Amino acid sequence: MPIKILSPQLANQIAAGEVVERPASVVKELVENSLDAGANKIQIDIENGGANLIRIRDNGCGIPKEELSLALARHATSKIADLDDLEAILSLGFRGEALASISSVSRLTLTSRTEEQTEAWQVYAQGRDMETTIKPASHPVGTTVEVANLFFNTPARRKFLRTDKTEFSHIDEVIRRIALTKFNTAFTLTHNGKIIRQYRPAEAINQQLKRVAAICGDDFVKNALRIEWKHDDLHLSGWVATPNFSRTQNDLSYCYINGRMVRDKVISHAIRQAYAQYLPTDAYPAFVLFIDLNPHDVDVNVHPTKHEVRFHQQRLIHDFIYEGISHALNNQEQINWHTDQSAVENHEENTVREPQPNYSIRPNRATAGQNSFAPQYHEKPQQNQPHFSNTPMFPNHVSTGYRDYRSDAPSKTEQRLYAELLRTLPPTAQKDISDTAQQNISDTAKIISTEIIECSSHLRALSLIENRALLLQQNQDFFLLSLEKLQRLQWQLALKQIQIEQQALLIPIVFRLTESQFQAWQQYSDDFKKIGFEFIENQAQLRLTLNKVPSALRTQNLQKCVMAMLTRDENSSSFLTALCAQLECKTFNALADALNLLSETERLLTQTNRTAFTQLLKPVNWQPLLDEI
């Protein structure tokens, strides 16, 4: 066969093999185009896993009418003009291949309008011929790209597509990756008409943390350390997880270079070395890192899908990242976050929130599957590793061993924070538990077989009624005990103790108040302090920071509770009664849980306050029913 130049149509389809691997590849290219156009609101609509329809709508700058046809041509772009631009790329796209490649294997419709235009225009291209048709359309400022029937003219490619669920899970991963670096952009992802993801803009640090938690999980945020590290033109920021939050698979490793997610061996090696003395070789660190540097110092044009980069000074980048992460791990006690009240309101009161994953796809971490963009580690386990002491050390040289962070010797942070967070009862309180109450707690494991358990007040628990009440027996008498009222009594008794156990908040809560709310705070500050709350007051800024809470209330929505107390009617019930009325009662689905609550309440009872408990017992008269038998 003689050598000849390929037709543009065939060349585009060959190029599409690199750019358009699956529907997720199309979504990635089109969303990156929207971001390059300055969009801060992007909606992604998917049908049947992307095989039938992919629609990307944005509010970017739009494309002028005279450039619409050119936008679908190969090697046509507005992002670079000469070699100097290519050597200093900051945009996500720059080759001008995506739209041409996508349109060659699908039916593509592009509708756009610029701010200067009075009407929008639409261009349509289909398949191999790639002939375009332009006509007027109705559309706001911005662009909408619809990709229908992907691979309709390449059956061999289409048959390799997986199930709709699998293909959509790859699209979902792409959106999560992009949303993790573009905090100022709102993303909405739908599948077959149902909203699956909805990320609102996140400018403040607390809002960014909320998005990170929605993508990486709450446990990652609870164990993450904020990192800020600078040297000349290099800037490293983001979050690294403490070593005790290590992973068995490399599924929570995200790294971005100038806003672009990449895989790079230099970065992977630096991160691995920073954790080397804390993690075994079969464990992986969790991190979300953003590296900003001079675009002239990195080449992003080395991979067909731009997933890999090449640094001009690899050793400098390696040492910079290693030192930054090592410094963050070594100074865990000095890193703190403040959560804004506006970002942590009660879920029912939020008009916009991060939605939970739809049942039809795999939820977020840790069951969302392998992160294909996480750095790949291939280090083999090392034999005869040297022993390391329990004292954290960060030598300048590279260590070949590791210290197991899960060993018996706790780190400084574990001693100061985690041990305090996990403590639930003070030693004195545990000593006060009566022998009978202790027996009740141990007996709860035998409820199913015994059905009747004796409590310390000589009451026998017979049954849990509709998850709301306990049916109790004392001699020949029967009583109903409301579990909701019992919980509120238990809270009041716990908060009346002479020594109240406190729990430190890993992430302090910041309240920004109005003048009237701050005046109410000054009135009730002693009451809050008396029951175990610890605030830091900033009168000039009308701001409160909540650092510690009573352990009995550690699972409550304290943001809502505190704000409700600062706006309550002064002439209503007492402070403690009003506070307990704001707390959310637990739902009891098992008799064992209800008996634990009863035992804990009885432990707090004394001769002076036992009357409050007996008043909750409502007698049950069986005689009328027995007479009818």
From Swiss-Prot:
Keywords: DNA damage, DNA repair. CDD domains: HATPase_MutL-MLH-PMS-like (cd16926), MutL_Trans_MutL (cd03482). InterPro entries: DNA_mismatch_repair_CS, DNA_mismatch_repair_MutL, DNA_mismatch_S5_2-like, HATPase_C_sf, MutL/Mlh/PMS, MutL/Mlh/Pms-like, MutL_C, MutL_C_dimsub. GO terms for biological process: mismatch repair. The keyword DNA repair applies. GO terms for cellular component: mismatch repair complex. Belongs to the DNA mismatch repair MutL/HexB family. HAMAP family: DNA_mis_repair (MF_00149). This is DNA mismatch repair protein MutL. The gene is mutL.
